[in-house]
Amino acid sequence: MKPSIVAKLEALHERHEEVQALLGDAGIIADQDRFRALSREYAQLSDVSRCFTDWQQVQDDIETAQMMLDDPEMREMAQEELREAKEKSEQLEQQLQVLLLPKDPDDERNAFLEVRAGTGGDEAALFAGDLFRMYSRYAEARRWRVEIMSMSEGEHGGYKEIIAKISGDGVYGRLKFESGGHRVQRVPATESQGRIHTSACTVAVMPELPEAELPDINPADLRIDTFRSSGAGGQHVNTTDSAIRITHLPTGIVVECQDERSQHKNKAKALSVLGARIHAAETAKRQQAEASTRRNLLGSGDRSDRNRTYNFPQGRVTDHRINLTLYRLDETMEGKLDMLIEPIVQEHQADLLAALSEQE
């Protein structure tokens, strides 16, 4: 391992011990805000510190085994111990490099999921419904909570657009690479000739930001329209203008919310989605500016022109960003997404590691 990385790890290990001592200080315990901040830092440093301690122990084992090689009676055993220690050292180095990667502060946050039907008319709306069901099943398996914020149903089923908030541990970090184009190839139910049609949907995943981090929005930049809800809600539906449409005039971003019976609640929800969209647009703009001065666009989720193709006749799903093809479409549509998400997370980590090596 490079000396510069070892020095960085030593500093983090020392900070971990320092924070541990501070957490036992009566003055710190009395200051709840400081105590919470240090507790978070301690938790973040614990894995790195533990892994680095293991790595240091293995370096001692390697040194001991190398000394034993000079003893003819111990040589065979020393060679075996040396091989095992070097193997373990390599594994720990890989773990440490991943632990040192810059963390996206949004990864642990809840997320807004938007699925929109694109080209393909009714079939695209049906596929948008299939995608939303797929993500809902995945969320259910991970014990996340799905709350529909707004939806516009297709004429023959599915959705022209659906927006949901997904709450739970690490939602955004897990779903952020889903943003982009999703294409389906299948025979629509309305197709009498049995011809395969291609339709498309777009998916957007944005972190839910705490109020303090939401972008400043000038009320004068907003046009707020009210209209009658067309969704579920029993007798109350279509009797009051409870649904809200907010247009952010400088960017042209439009958000609708009609899920709640209360206009006030719909407005609050719509504003939170609007803030997330503006933040996402600003982040994308900043990353594009950074990319123009760097060789690769890293850590942006900008793998999005055409994420996946779902080919129903062949039972195939292909992720074009990493050239991954799996013949497990049925499982995918039932929400078993880890087999697709994990490889792209690993690819992203590999990109970051390459950038880290270049910096070193």
UniProtKB/Swiss-Prot annotation:
Protein location: Cytoplasm
PROSITE patterns: RF_PROK_I
HAMAP family for this protein: Rel_fac_1
Known function: Peptide chain release factor 1 directs the termination of translation in response to the peptide chain termination codons UAG and UAA.
Protein family per UniProt: Belongs to the prokaryotic/mitochondrial release factor family.
Pfam hit, one: PCRF
Name by which UniProt lists this protein: Peptide chain release factor 1
GO cellular component: cytoplasm
Post-translational modification: Methylated by PrmC. Methylation increases the termination efficiency of RF1.
Organism annotation: Salmonella typhimurium (strain LT2 / SGSC1412 / ATCC 700720)
Predominant location: cytoplasm
Keyword Cytoplasm applies: yes
Key words, A-Z: Cytoplasm, Methylation, Protein biosynthesis
Positions of region (Disordered): 284-313
Keyword Transit peptide: no
InterPro entries from the UniProt entry: PCRF, Pep_chain_release_fac_I, Pep_chain_release_fac_I_sf, Prokaryotic/Mito_RF, RF-1
Residues with N5-methylglutamine modification: 235
A GO molecular-function annotation: translation release factor activity, codon specific
